[in-house]
Amino acid sequence: MAASVRILGIDPGSRVTGFGVIDVRGRDHFYVASGCIKTPADAPLADRIAVIVRHIGEVVAVYKPQQAAVEQVFVNVNPASTLMLGQARGAALAALVSHKLPVSEYTALQVKQAVVGKGKAAKEQVQHMVVQMLGLSGTPQADAADGLAVALTHALRNHGLASRLNPSGMQVKRGRFQ
């Protein structure tokens, strides 16, 4: 039987950071946990970052993932929002690295393509596919579903057929090894 790998996926946000934990055994994906880390909207930025770092540390301590994946920041129309999102993402990365976890990063487009099959998918489509892929009985909150989608993306890109066919680490682009 294939060894199990536990992956923590993070969807960073300055107000709500979603997380999802899955186990991967061979080609199968199993739900472990998911949730949202909510920061007080009226708190100073340093306090909000501390909440993110502390809670991600708690998730790592409880679920003991072996790998982590984080969604990359997209550039928003509002520079202040983009900066705050980047700081929340930095807090998440710092928390993961401080626990010596290997971290991979994926764009929102890569996550949507991996989970739904198209990069322009709506949040509801991502939630639906997360439920289907993990056999969940209910629909997780949007941010938690995004965290699970990031973990699934990492699993599909690194523990799927392409990685077994290509152990040398070559990249696959447009269906071809490069």
UniProtKB/Swiss-Prot annotation:
Biological process (GO), any one: DNA recombination
Cofactor binding: number and manner: Binds 2 Mg(2+) ion per subunit.
Binding site for Mg(2+) 2: 71
Catalytic site positions: 11, 71, 143
Catalytic function, reaction form: Endonucleolytic cleavage at a junction such as a reciprocal single-stranded crossover between two homologous DNA duplexes (Holliday junction)
Domain of life, per lineage: Bacteria
Subcellular location: Cytoplasm
InterPro entries attached to this UniProt entry: RNaseH-like_sf, RNaseH_sf, X-over_junc_endoDNase_Mg_BS, X-over_junc_endoDNase_RuvC
Regions crossing the membrane: none
One Gene Ontology molecular-function label: DNA binding
EC nos: 3.1.21.10
Keywords, comma-separated and alphabetical: Cytoplasm, DNA damage, DNA recombination, DNA repair, DNA-binding, Endonuclease, Hydrolase, Magnesium, Metal-binding, Nuclease
Pfam families for this protein: RuvC
Requisite cofactors: Mg(2+)
Residue sites binding Mg(2+) 1 per the record: 11, 143
Intrachain disulfide bonds: none
GO cellular component: cytoplasm; Holliday junction resolvase complex
Family: Belongs to the RuvC family.
Subunit and interaction comment: Homodimer which binds Holliday junction (HJ) DNA. The HJ becomes 2-fold symmetrical on binding to RuvC with unstacked arms; it has a different conformation from HJ DNA in complex with RuvA. In the full resolvosome a probable DNA-RuvA(4)-RuvB(12)-RuvC(2) complex forms which resolves the HJ.
Biological role stated in the UniProt entry: The RuvA-RuvB-RuvC complex processes Holliday junction (HJ) DNA during genetic recombination and DNA repair. Endonuclease that resolves HJ intermediates. Cleaves cruciform DNA by making single-stranded nicks across the HJ at symmetrical positions within the homologous arms, yielding a 5'-phosphate and a 3'-hydroxyl group; requires a central core of homology in the junction. The consensus cleavage sequence is 5'-(A/T)TT(C/G)-3'. Cleavage occurs on the 3'-side of the TT dinucleotide at the point of strand exchange.
Protein name (record): Crossover junction endodeoxyribonuclease RuvC
Gene this chain is encoded by: ruvC
